[in-house]
């Protein structure tokens, strides 16, 4: 077996892992959102989290085996990010899972096979760990796999025993480590030595149930949960010193370094830490915003805000003074879009959120940094080593300066912050807030279960009624419970009964009105929290009071559109199973009033012919006027009849079945047409990939078709008018314009180079002779970095033995400097990379490159003459 595994890119590692297990009957599933279903955690923190209900016996899995590459975010070790080799906030966890199917022996065998035969690790480079009491796993590694006993380490419960909580499913685990230095031998192996070992694959064997007394009882159905860190595998296979220098992260770091005008490899450790923090955190924020998390002061929104602010501050620490996060985000989007196309689809939202947060925080920094500097000076003058909690709270309360940022700046100045004092001030502030309101025990964001004793849960009537008389049980303003609300107010209303469908199963909530004696509320959305339907809307007239009797009326036109799109989604899945592959299953969906979106598991793109056939099949079923049959059945009976369930979805003992006989039968709680003919027509707009092994179809149906056609006609007409051609001539005209643009860009680049060369040729007569060498040091006006480099190379070629240093300001506050040295100059001990990096610091930048040719950047254009003057002086001193 090779001890020199082949280089693989991050994307290749991900695909190799998923395909390995797909070939072994595992269903490839898309990464779940970073917003988890589990209410006990803010963010998806592990590859197994989406399957936790299955492991806990709360859901019945559709598949016995699954494999995923799961996006994860953890911030518990945020202070270590950039300071260690492998700590991250964002990471990808590759995993294979068994739900009551294969167990320990097979999981270990496949873990070893993919490590040695697929990724090419030599057995001599691998060490495994087992739980100290797991003799079974120890024997499998020793007897069946053949791992030497000296390279099987028994570890305690803290390291090698997985638990889901104080009670419940649990079990031992076994980890595979890569050994960078097997030549050091097998004696005194210390797996905590991260200079030698890195754990890259964890196999969890869920085989016990732990009761309240701590007793372990074997589970009837044993499960497998594994995790392979993608970034760690990339570090090993790409032979780089840490996770940050892999192709998954380093291009982001390089982008940040380029903006700062510095070179990563020649930077000091403090600068490298800041660059790593930026590289890591930008990955997190891009994926968080792509998963529709918005920055705020609570929950996961606060995590996002904190990460963005850390990016901005570390940008300042490396010399970036203006806004830059959207540029770095573009690099992260480009790296991620092949595996997660939603980041490109959400590009505008990502950049808008970043720009808004960065702009606001820069103002916060400007206001707060000056005061913090004064506080630090005062603390030092007093001989103290701690910033008071009161001072830290003033920064937070008055200037919006986060406590974490105050703590970071304090640490850089060898000070601490009185966090307890800060919290005490915060409690005083909260007390003032509580005094201003009566008891607040109802929030839209949180669970409403605690109100079950005080108000009636909502009875849903929407399957059979479009209007209903109801009682107002609760009114909320910005999540705060109120007894009444006035006209013009945005409110959330809980009714005792409602015809409004609440957002669920991919279908958005109904729209409509709540009205009563002098009251009109426009309902703009409906969401379900526990057993309560929360109606979001605006009071257009009157005063709304708890206990009022009102009429709740949905907008029938919106409901018809949603029903048409939802039933069309069911028909679409049935058509995909019939025409493309019977094994296709739903991976996600969106049913709105104007369109539908259906994500499904499929390892390849559909052909144009398949897309057309699917569309034709759906329209055929619509034309055949199939009547709907709706039943509520026991879950087992529904599945026995062949009803399609969504993998990982939680179902009760009884389920609602939507059946269009001989066409489609699914478990579904949404609203549907009573006959397929009501849909009218169905049109596929697009088919594309959204993740590895997951495709997405977007379509329109019913009344929304007319909106789509009108919009398309308007776009075509606008383009035809703009280009002054007939609609059918547009493709040729656009192709022609694209060709002209490419040619113009090439001509422009050529002209730039020619202009730079022309400017540089005039410098030949300014060459000075120093010893046996000629030197040229000069500033060229408005020359871009690439053309400046070409000019320097040409000048050096003409003078032969010598050195050329050129500088330019291609745009405001951006300096470019190039150094080109002949071999004779190199022999004098001058290296272009080090030389140009040193003089660029005068302009507030840095850079580097090869001994004979190097380039650097800076931010202070006013200092360029000083930098070039220093370059000339240094060259003359060294070459004389």
UniProtKB/Swiss-Prot annotation:
Residues that bind Zn(2+), according to the entry? 566, 570, 668, 672
Where exactly are the transmembrane stretches of this chain?
Answer: none
Q: Which GO terms describe its molecular function?
A: alanine-tRNA ligase activity; aminoacyl-tRNA deacylase activity; ATP binding; tRNA binding; zinc ion binding
Q: Any note on cofactor binding?
A: Binds 1 zinc ion per subunit.
Instruction: Tell me where it mainly resides.
Output: cytoplasm
- Which SUPFAM superfamilies does this entry report, sorted A to Z? Class II aaRS and biotin synthetases (SSF55681), Putative anticodon-binding domain of alanyl-tRNA synthetase (AlaRS) (SSF101353), ThrRS/AlaRS common domain (SSF55186), Translation proteins (SSF50447)
Sorted alphabetically, which PROSITE patterns does this protein's record hold?
AA_TRNA_LIGASE_II_ALA
Compartments it resides in: Cytoplasm
Any one annotated GO CC term: cytosol
Cross-referenced InterPro entries: aa-tRNA-synth_II/BPL/LPL (IPR045864), Ala-tRNA-lgiase_IIc (IPR002318), Ala-tRNA-ligase_IIc_anticod-bd (IPR018162), Ala-tRNA-synth_IIc_core (IPR018165), Ala-tRNA-synth_IIc_N (IPR018164), Ala-tRNA_ligase (IPR050058), Ala_tRNA_ligase_euk/bac (IPR023033), DHHA1_dom (IPR003156)
Which UniProt key words apply to this protein?
A: Aminoacyl-tRNA synthetase, ATP-binding, Cytoplasm, Ligase, Metal-binding, Nucleotide-binding, Protein biosynthesis, RNA-binding, tRNA-binding, Zinc
Biological processes annotated in GO: alanyl-tRNA aminoacylation
Give the reaction(s) catalysed: tRNA(Ala) + L-alanine + ATP = L-alanyl-tRNA(Ala) + AMP + diphosphate
Top EC class, one word? ligase
**Cofactor(s) demanded:** Zn(2+)
Q: Which Pfam families match?
A: DHHA1, tRNA-synt_2c, tRNA_SAD
So what family is this one in? Answer: Belongs to the class-II aminoacyl-tRNA synthetase family.
Q: Which PANTHER family match?
A: ALANINE--TRNA LIGASE, CYTOPLASMIC, ALANYL-TRNA SYNTHETASE
- What is the name attached to this protein's record? Alanine--tRNA ligase
Organism this protein belongs to: Nostoc punctiforme (strain ATCC 29133 / PCC 73102)
């Amino acid at each position: 077996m090779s001890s020199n595994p082949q280089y693989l890119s991050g994307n290749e590692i991900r695909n190799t892992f998923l395909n390995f297990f797909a070939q072994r009957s595992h269903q490839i599933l898309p990464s779940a959102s970073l917003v988890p279903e589990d209410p006990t955690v803010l963010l998806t923190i592990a590859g197994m989290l989406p399957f936790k209900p299955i492991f806990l016996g709360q859901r019945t899995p559709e598949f016995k085996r699954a494999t995923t590459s799961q996006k994860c975010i953890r911030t518990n070790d945020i202070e270590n990010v950039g300071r260690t080799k492998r700590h991250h906030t964002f990471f990808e966890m590759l995993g294979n899972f068994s739900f009551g199917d294969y167990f320990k022996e097979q999981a270990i065998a496949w873990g070893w096979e993919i490590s040695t035969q697929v990724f090419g690790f030599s057995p001599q480079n691998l060490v495994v760990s087992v739980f100290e009491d797991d003799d079974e796993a120890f024997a499998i590694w020793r007897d069946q796999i053949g791992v030497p006993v000296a390279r099987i380490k028994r570890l305690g419960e803290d390291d090698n025993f997985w638990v889901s909580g104080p009670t419940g499913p649990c079990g031992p685990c076994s980890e595979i480590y890569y050994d960078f230095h097997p030549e050091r031998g097998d004696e005194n192996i210390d797996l905590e030595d991260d200079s030698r070992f890195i754990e890259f694959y964890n196999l969890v064997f869920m085989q016990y149930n732990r009761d309240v007394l701590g007793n372990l009882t074997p589970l009837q159905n044993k499960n497998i949960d594994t995790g392979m860190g993608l970034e760690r595998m990339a570090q090993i296979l790409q032979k780089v010193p840490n996770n940050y220098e892999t192709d998954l992260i380093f291009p982001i770091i390089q982008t940040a370094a380029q903006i700062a005008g510095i070179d990563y490899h020649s930077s000091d450790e403090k600068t490298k830490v800041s660059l790593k923090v930026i590289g890591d955190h930008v990955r997190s924020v891009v994926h968080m915003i792509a998963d529709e998390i918005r920055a705020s002061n609570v929950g996961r929104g606060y995590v996002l805000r904190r990460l963005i602010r850390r990016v901005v501050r570390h940008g300042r620490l490396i010399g970036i003074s203006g806004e830059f996060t959207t540029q770095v985000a573009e690099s992260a989007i480009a790296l991620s879009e092949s595996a997660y196309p939603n980041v490109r689809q959400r590009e505008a939202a990502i950049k808008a959120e970043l720009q808004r947060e960065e702009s606001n925080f820069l103002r916060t920094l400007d206001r707060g940094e000056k005061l913090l500097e004064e506080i630090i000076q005062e603390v030092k003058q007093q001989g103290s080593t701690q910033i008071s909690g009161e001072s830290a709270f003033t920064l937070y309360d008055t200037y919006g300066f986060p406590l974490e940022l105050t703590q970071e700046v304090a640490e850089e100045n060898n000070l601490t912050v009185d966090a307890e004092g800060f919290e005490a001030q915060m409690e005083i502030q909260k007390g003032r807030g509580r005094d201003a309101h009566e008891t607040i025990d109802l929030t839209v964001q949180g669970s409403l279960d605690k109100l079950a004793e005080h108000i009636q849960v909502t009875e849903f009537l929407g399957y059979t009624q479009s209007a209903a008389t109801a009682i107002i049980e609760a009114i909320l303003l910005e999540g705060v419970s109120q007894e009444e609300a006035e006209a013009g107010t945005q409110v959330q209303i809980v009714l005792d009964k409602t015809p409004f469908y609440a957002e669920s199963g991919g279908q958005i909530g109904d729209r409509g009105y709540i009205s009563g004696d002098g009251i009109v509320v426009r309902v703009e959305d409906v969401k379900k929290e526990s057993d309560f339907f929360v109606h979001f809307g605006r009071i257009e007239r009157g005063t709304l009071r708890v206990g009022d009797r009102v009429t709740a009326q949905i907008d029938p036109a919106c409901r018809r559109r949603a029903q048409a799109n939802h039933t069309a989604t069911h028909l679409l899945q049935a058509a995909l199973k019939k025409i493309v592959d019977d094994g296709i299953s739903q991976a996600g969906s969106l049913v709105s009033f104007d369109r539908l979106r259906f994500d499904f598991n499929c390892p390849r793109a559909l052909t144009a012919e398949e897309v057309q056939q699917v569309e034709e099949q759906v329209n055929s079923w619509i034309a055949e006027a199939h009547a709907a049959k709706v039943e509520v059945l026991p879950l087992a009976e529904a599945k026995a009849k062949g009803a399609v369930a969504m993998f990982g979805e939680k179902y009760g003992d009884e389920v609602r079945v939507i059946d269009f006989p001989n066409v489609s039968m699914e478990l579904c709680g949404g609203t549907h047409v009573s006959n397929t003919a009501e849909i009218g027509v169905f049109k596929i707009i697009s088919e594309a990939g959204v993740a590895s092994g997951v495709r997405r179809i977007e379509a329109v149906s019913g009344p929304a078709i007319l909106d789509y056609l009108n919009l398309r006609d308007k776009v075509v007409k606008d383009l035809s008018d703009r280009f002054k051609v007939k609609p059918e001539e547009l493709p040729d005209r656009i192709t022609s314009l694209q060709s002209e643009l490419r040619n113009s860009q090439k001509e422009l680049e050529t002209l730039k180079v020619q202009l730079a060369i022309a400017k540089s040729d005039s410098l030949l007569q300014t060459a000075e002779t120093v010893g046996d060498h000629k030197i040229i040091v000069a500033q060229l006006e408005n020359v871009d970095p690439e053309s400046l480099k070409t000019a320097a190379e040409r000048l050096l070629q003409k003078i032969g033995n010598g050195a050329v240093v050129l500088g330019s300001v291609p745009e405001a506050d951006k300096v470019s400097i190039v150094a080109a040295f002949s071999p004779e100059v190199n022999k004098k001990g001058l290296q272009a990379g080090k030389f140009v990096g040193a003089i660029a610091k005068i302009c507030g930048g840095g850079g580097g490159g090869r001994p004979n040719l190097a380039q650097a950047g800076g931010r202070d254009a006013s200092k360029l003459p000083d930098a070039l003057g220093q370059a000339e002086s240094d060259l003359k001193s060294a070459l004389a």
